[in-house]
Each structure stands twice: as structure tokens, then as C-alpha cells.
Amino acid sequence: MVTQNKKILIITGSFGNGHLQVTNSVVNQLNEMNLKHLSVIEHDLFMEAHPILTSICKKYYINSFKYFRNSYKQFYYSRPEDVNKCFYKYYGLNKLINLLIKEKPDLILLTFPTPVMSVLTEQFNMNIPIATVMTDYRLHKNWVTPHSSRYYVATPDLKQEFVNVGVPEDIIKITGIPISEQFDEDIDTKVWMHKNHLDPNRPTILMSAGAFGVSKGFDVMISDILERSPETQIVMICGRNKELKRALRQQFKEYANVLILGYTHHMNEWMASSHLMVTKPGGITISEALARKIPMIFLDPAPGQELENAHYFQSKGMGKIADTTEEAIQLITELTQDENALAHMAEQMQDLKVKYPTYKLCRDLLHLLDHSSQFEEIYGKVPMYAKLFIK
């Protein structure tokens, strides 16, 4: 496998950490395979092509979940023909062409929805195979690139969605979403809980404050959960929000069943050791939770990929949507007092769990690479109005 020099170009994006995490998982897996004839390069296309404008767009994207939900909803659910007429389709085109001419890759791997790639495949002459890693659980039009060689998806349902829009069934592989291999490794959860001075036999709620991007309301939420379900224990991950961590630690310092943490490298251990997780339905987070079979409550998911992921997991019995904090507290109370309900949700997750997704994806990727042809020059034309946006 890969007996002659080959190069993979990974196109990613830094709109949220999920796409970068997928990229890192793939790169790390390929490195572990010790392929002497393979080189892998990665580029954040939009940031490199238009750093100032992309930075502004990233801030808008992050704030859209809190302040501009309706405008993001309108963009996400816009019709395909609306996107085709939009400059966004040509965003980063010139940078992408220059990258291909400079690097001469044997294969392009997309870990971020990149509509500009469709411009290359439809309006330019190009013989480079393109593979796409879908990082969510429902299809969005921006993930579809005409004349692609491969799509890697999370579930049979998502594969069928691609087939329904005309993608050939034989180029869609169900590999799961690439995550770290550690989420498939065995963990002694009793040892982990004792190490952190918690009771492994009590229902444990894992809450990730960093996923919500807000600092208020968690003190009341924790207090209400403990009042209604005093037998539970809570692990709160505050991420890099030092002020929130300090405030919560001060408020709950006398509670042996509340653990307040900052940024942690041990989400794997906490997911494996907890019984229920309150989080936002980002593609990577819920894939890690799926691997650990920890049921989830999705608190106020934003319109777009978050809400679509949440609806999918709820439809499969693996999670529940709470539109308000009060709804979330009520669901937590009901589930922590019903072991059978939690166990049933975990069983449902077993049916969709794919072990070692990154390894499976990389094995197929290398097979695809073996059949790639030699790089040829790229040429073509784009509409005149698009030339304003392709630098």
C-alpha cells in the first residue's frame, strides 16, 4: 500500500474546533501507519485566502448561536440555487488553485464544507480524486461536491440521504466520524471516580459549560438538579472560563458530590464514567459520546447543524432536546431516577456505534490513493462576477 511517493492535501476550516479535530485524528492515524512514501499537508483554506474577512465571519458564526440565530438559520436552510448565485461559492478559489498547482496533490480530503471545490470540479479540468469527511449526522448541500470519488459518513441513514440527492451509492462509505482512538479503549471507571473522590455507584451528570459559550445560569441549574435529585453527583467542565470555574468552586465548595473543573484533557474518562451528559450537539462531541454510549440532553440547540444533529439523536432514542433550562432539569430528574430509561438509551447507541472510525477511513483513503492518477494542469473559466471574490 502506497509504494510510490504520494501526497494528500487536507482542506479544513477553523469555524469551531470540530473540523480541526477530525483533521488531527486523520493526520495522527496516517502518521501511526508509518507510510514512508506518503506526505500529508493541511490548509485552512478560507483563513489563508481571506484572513481578515474570514476572522470577521468566524466571530459572526460564533455569535450567531447566541444573537443572530434567525440570520444563520436563513443561511443554513437556503435553497441550493441561492448558494449557487452567492459569492460564497467562489470564496477562496484563487488560493485553492494556487495550492493545487504548488503542491500537486494526488488526493484532496475535505474535512470542512467547501462549496468552492464544486467550482473546480464543474468548471475546471481536474483529475485529482476528492474525498469528503462528513462531520455531522444530517446532510447539508454544501457537503456535496460533484464528481467526488468518496464520501465518508457516520450512519446508514446519512448514506441514504446522499443517495437521495443523486450521489452514487458505491462511493459512500459508512466509517463513522473520525475521533481519537482513546474513545474505543477500555477504562476502569471505578478507579477513575475514586481517584477524583467521587462515588462510582451514584448517577453522574457530566455538564460541559464551554460548549455553551455562556457563564450565567449554571449555579442555579446545579442547585436545582441537586435539590430534585440529591442522590446524583455533578461534574462541571468550565473549559477556559476561569471566572466561571472560580465562582462555581466557591459556591459548591462544601458539596462532596459536585466537582468543578476547568479545561481538561480527560473528556474521554469523564464520558466513560458518567451516566448522562448535558451538552451542545456538535458533531465531534456527540460522536465521542456515541463511542462511550453516554446518553445526552441537548440544551437549546441552535438552528442549523446543531439542531439537525439533535433531532437525529432524539429520533434514534439516544438523546433528548431541552429548549429551556427548566426542561433540561426536568429531563435530568426523570432520567436519573429511571435506570431502565438510561440503559435503554445507551443500548440504542450501541446499534450506531462504529469502532475505530479513523482507522477504517484511513484504510479506505489509502486504497483510493493507490488508484489516483498523475497530477495534470488545471484550467477553466468562472463567471465574470465571481472574479471579484476569488483572490
Swiss-Prot record:
What Gene Ontology terms describe what this protein does at the molecular function level? 1,2-diacylglycerol 3-glucosyltransferase activity
Q: Give a yes or no for keyword Plastid in this entry.
A: no
Query: Which GO CC terms are listed, alphabetically?
Result: plasma membrane
Q: Which InterPro entries match?
A: Diacylglyc_glucosyltr_N, Glyco_trans_28_C, Glycosyltransf_28_UgtP, Pro_diacylglycrl_glcsylTrfase
The catalytic activity, as recorded, is: a 1,2-diacyl-3-O-(beta-D-glucopyranosyl)-sn-glycerol + UDP-alpha-D-glucose = a 1,2-diacyl-3-O-(beta-D-Glc-(1->6)-beta-D-Glc)-sn-glycerol + UDP + H(+); a 1,2-diacyl-sn-glycerol + UDP-alpha-D-glucose = a 1,2-diacyl-3-O-(beta-D-glucopyranosyl)-sn-glycerol + UDP + H(+)
Q: Could you tell me the EC number(s) of this protein? A: 2.4.1.315
- The keyword Lipid biosynthesis is annotated on this UniProt entry: yes
UniProt GO BP: enterobacterial common antigen biosynthetic process; glycolipid biosynthetic process; lipoteichoic acid biosynthetic process
Superkingdom, taxonomy of origin = Bacteria
Q: Where in the cell is it found?
A: Cell membrane
Q: In which pathway does it act?
A: Glycolipid metabolism; diglucosyl-diacylglycerol biosynthesis
Keyword terms: Carbohydrate metabolism, Cell membrane, Glycosyltransferase, Lipid biosynthesis, Lipid metabolism, Membrane, Transferase
Q: Per its UniProt record, what Pfam families does this chain match?
A: Glyco_tran_28_C, MGDG_synth
Function summary: Processive glucosyltransferase involved in the biosynthesis of both the bilayer- and non-bilayer-forming membrane glucolipids. Is able to successively transfer two glucosyl residues to diacylglycerol (DAG), thereby catalyzing the formation of beta-monoglucosyl-DAG (3-O-(beta-D-glucopyranosyl)-1,2-diacyl-sn-glycerol) and beta-diglucosyl-DAG (3-O-(beta-D-glucopyranosyl-beta-(1->6)-D-glucopyranosyl)-1,2-diacyl-sn-glycerol). Beta-diglucosyl-DAG is the predominant glycolipid found in Bacillales and is also used as a membrane anchor for lipoteichoic acid (LTA).
The record's family statement is: Belongs to the glycosyltransferase 28 family. UgtP subfamily.
* Name of the protein: Processive diacylglycerol beta-glucosyltransferase
The scientific name of the source species is: Staphylococcus carnosus (strain TM300)
